[in-house]
Amino acid sequence: MKRRGAIRLIKKAAADRRLTFTSHALDEMDEEGETRESVASALRHAESFALQENGRWRIHGVGLTAIVQVDDAAVIVWTVFTG
């Protein structure tokens, strides 16, 4: 999938609350005091998207960074951290 399509899919999934969270992401969110809604909002409004060598996207949103995978129509949040 091309960059523009991946970004569009990530933002749409975040807006529609169709994100899948790994157990690791949920644990990290709990530690950081983040919610599914705050992560979705950060992804929806993010402006920095970097494709990593492993095929996952490093996304810098307002107040947090998320690592996500775009898998066909699914957007999987692998981890979340602040900063």
Label the predicted regions.
Residues 1-83:
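Ribonuclease/tRNase effector modules and their secretory precursors
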